[in-house]
Amino acid sequence: MLRFLNQCSQGRGAWLLMAFTALALELTALWFQHVMLLKPCVLCIYERCALFGVLGAALIGAIAPKTPLRYVAMVIWLYSAFRGVQLTYEHTMLQLYPSPFATCDFMVRFPEWLPLDKWVPQVFVASGDCAERQWDFLGLEMPQWLLGIFIAYLIVAVLVVISQPFKAKKRDLFGR
């Protein structure tokens, strides 16, 4: 399995698949916000940024999968997935155990040199409350679904990093 993951990390297909999944999730978030009129909270915006990190890592990995640039992509992927797990766990706890003493910030805080909320307000402005439950599917709230997604991204990222010392087999996928 590790050789297969190493082989996948050196091809564009797996990186593009990861980019496609992250882009699909971002577009779904925008659908919820602009079509279903759900208000994203501060943690939702940070989770969106972590997902953009996964998307960016996938695009970097797809650019040059056989060069050391893929290691940069793996580091960004690991960091973004880890931060996504942290943020969605915190968001899930705020929704499952609401408290007037534990709340999220009122505004998103981006660095002064990267004011995403001012550059692209349709995507990065928060207007909702983190503890408010706005949507569920099969009994799980949106942060709980994202927690599972980020955990999956993180597990696969760790396995791909572990697989790097193993040499990929020199055959195509059809065994010729």
From Swiss-Prot:
- GO cellular component terms, A-Z: plasma membrane
Cysteine pairings via disulfide bonds:
C41-C44, C104-C130
Membrane-related topology note: Multi-pass membrane protein
List the ranges whose topology is Cytoplasmic. 1-14, 66-71, 164-176
**Alphabetical list of InterPro entries matching this protein:** DiS_bond_form_DsbB/BdbC, Disulphide_bond_form_DsbB, DsbB, DsbB-like_sf
Q: Per UniProt, which keywords does this protein have? A: Cell inner membrane, Cell membrane, Chaperone, Disulfide bond, Electron transport, Membrane, Oxidoreductase, Redox-active center, Transmembrane, Transmembrane helix, Transport
Q: Where in the cell is it found?
A: Cell inner membrane
User: Where is this protein chiefly located?
Assistant: membrane
Stored Pfam families: DsbB
Q: Which residues cross the membrane?
A: 15-31, 50-65, 72-89, 145-163
Residues on the Periplasmic side?
32-49, 90-144
Report the domain of life of the source organism.
Bacteria
Describe the disruption phenotype: Induction of the PhoP/PhoQ two-component regulatory system.
Q: Which GO terms describe its molecular function?
A: electron transfer activity; oxidoreductase activity, acting on a sulfur group of donors, quinone or similar compound as acceptor; protein-disulfide reductase activity; ubiquinone binding
Keyword Cytoplasm assigned: no
| Protein's UniProt keywords contain Acyltransferase | no
Biological process (GO) annotations held by this record are: protein folding; response to heat
Q: Which NCBIfam families match?
A: PRK01749.1
The family line of this record is: Belongs to the DsbB family.
Q: Give the protein's function.
A: Required for disulfide bond formation in some periplasmic proteins such as PhoA or OmpA. Acts by oxidizing the DsbA protein. PhoP-regulated transcription is redox-sensitive, being activated when the periplasm becomes more reducing (deletion of dsbA/dsbB, treatment with dithiothreitol). MgrB acts between DsbA/DsbB and PhoP/PhoQ in this pathway.
The identity of this protein, by name, is Disulfide bond formation protein B
Which species expresses this protein natively?
A: Escherichia coli (strain K12)
Q: Taxonomically, what lineage is the organism?
A: Bacteria, Pseudomonadati, Pseudomonadota, Gammaproteobacteria, Enterobacterales
> What gene, per UniProt, encodes this protein?
dsbB
